């Protein structure tokens, strides 16, 4: 509610451009305002670019990425797809997590093959980056079970991320018991 109110004020840009935020809540509000405020896609991308380096935890990352579904991805899906590509190669834990969580908006017929190809190239060591990848694979499985199952059977993912992907699939309420039993049997040692 607070973010929506601030996003409607004329001076929201001053608050969003402030880089001296000390508190989690301030950073969260900035991200939400970037997602909610009325602006053209080009301006929103400008503010996204400024904001991503400020992300320092999974909650800010995930809520920020969720806020961008309608206002960024919904306004220029392929433009945003191109924009997030460098983040998918970042060495920074929360920059790459931002890129991966943004990929959740692309689990569709046009992008599923690219997402699974990217997953096989993924080698980041950071915990929150690996968790995001496991989460993305579980979403891919829910929406594209056959393609994702085929991917999992030949996946080059490291064992930890692979097994965490299986765990997330098993935890899903949208996967039936028989499929969960198959997924359990696919766990790798280590």
Short names for language-model regions:
Residues 1-190:
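Alpha-helical scaffold domains
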């Amino acid at each position: 509610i607070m973010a929506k109110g601030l996003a409607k004020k004329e001076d929201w840009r001053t608050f969003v451009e402030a880089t001296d935020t000390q508190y989690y809540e301030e950073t969260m509000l900035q991200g939400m305002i970037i997602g909610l405020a009325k602006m053209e896609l080009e301006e929103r991308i400008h503010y996204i670019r400024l904001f991503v380096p400020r992300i320092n935890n999974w909650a800010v990352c995930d809520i920020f990425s969720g806020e961008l579904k309608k206002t960024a991805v919904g306004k220029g899906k392929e433009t945003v797809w191109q924009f997030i590509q460098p983040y998918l190669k970042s060495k920074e834990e929360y920059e790459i997590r931002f890129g991966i969580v943004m990929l959740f908006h692309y689990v569709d017929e046009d992008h599923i093959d690219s997402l699974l190809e990217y997953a096989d190239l993924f080698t980041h060591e950071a915990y929150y980056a690996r968790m995001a990848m496991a989460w993305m694979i579980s979403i891919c499985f829910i929406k594209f079970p056959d393609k994702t199952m085929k991917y999992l059977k030949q996946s080059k993912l490291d064992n930890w991320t692979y097994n965490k992907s299986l765990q997330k699939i098993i935890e899903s309420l949208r996967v039936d018991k028989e499929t969960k039993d198959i997924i359990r049997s696919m766990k790798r040692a280590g």
